Each structure stands twice: as structure tokens, then as C-alpha cells.
């Protein structure tokens, strides 16, 4: 165990347009080389596309949170060595990590898509996630499937 103090969690300010902390986290994860304004443009553009595609009653922030909830994993597997053998042990995912994984998976899935601009890719991936399809949702399902397959080793939890 480390002898140092645990790092204090930094407070993240809500984004200027919607006043949502999760959207700021998403922007920070999307950002390359400290280019926050570029990341902001991409996220706000994608949310604008969601608003246009969703119809008059569609709130892009609600759709964004819905997409995120559909990608959040409940369980994951972690490697555990027991007597020379390595087991994939299913463990429940903490709330913060759930959110972090969902954000990371959405961004990775968006970057791998074939559309021309990142704005299009992100908006399409978010729409797919809202409708429970797409690469990010598939990643969550694969993670759950892996945990289900290794349920027998759940007594090795720590």
C-alpha cells in the first residue's frame, strides 16, 4: 500500500451552455493537447445534431444522459492470480468508474466510425446508444457476457 495521502478529487465546473458536469467530463475526455474549445465545438455540434434529429420535444442533454446510461457497465472482469492460474473474476463497477468507462467507450466508438467529421461520428454514436445499438453498447454487452461466463470465479472477489 502507498504511504502517501490519497489524491483529492478535483471539482469539475459545469459546462457553460447546459450547466452539466457530465458534459464537461465528456469534453475533457474528448480533448486532445488541451484544445478545449475544439472539444466544446465537437460536443455542442453533436448535441445540436441530436436536437435536430430528435424532433421538437427532444432535449439533447436528456438524450446524451440516456445514451450514457445505455453504455454504462454494471459488472466487469478483473484478473486475479490464484496458485499459478489467472482467473477472470467478475466484480461490480463503482459508480464513478461506470461513468468514466461509458464516456471512454462512447468516444472510442465515435473515433472508429466512418463518417467525415467527428461531430457527425459522435452524434451518430450517441443516437445509436440511445437506441441500444452501436459499438459502445456492444462493448458493454461483451463485458457483461464475459462477467456472466466467469460467474463461477466470483467467490475469488477481493
From Swiss-Prot:
HAMAP family in alphabetical order: Ribosomal_uS7_B
Role according to the record: One of the primary rRNA binding proteins, it binds directly to 16S rRNA where it nucleates assembly of the head domain of the 30S subunit. Is located at the subunit interface close to the decoding center, probably blocks exit of the E-site tRNA.
Protein name: Small ribosomal subunit protein uS7
A GO BP annotation: translation
Gene: rpsG
Organism per entry: Gluconacetobacter diazotrophicus (strain ATCC 49037 / DSM 5601 / CCUG 37298 / CIP 103539 / LMG 7603 / PAl5)
Keyword Secreted: no
Keyword entries, A-Z: Ribonucleoprotein, Ribosomal protein, RNA-binding, rRNA-binding, tRNA-binding
GO cellular component term of the entry, any: small ribosomal subunit
Transmembrane segments: none
Signal sequence region: none
GO MF terms, alphabetically ordered: rRNA binding; structural constituent of ribosome; tRNA binding
Quaternary data: Part of the 30S ribosomal subunit. Contacts proteins S9 and S11.
Membership in a protein family: Belongs to the universal ribosomal protein uS7 family.
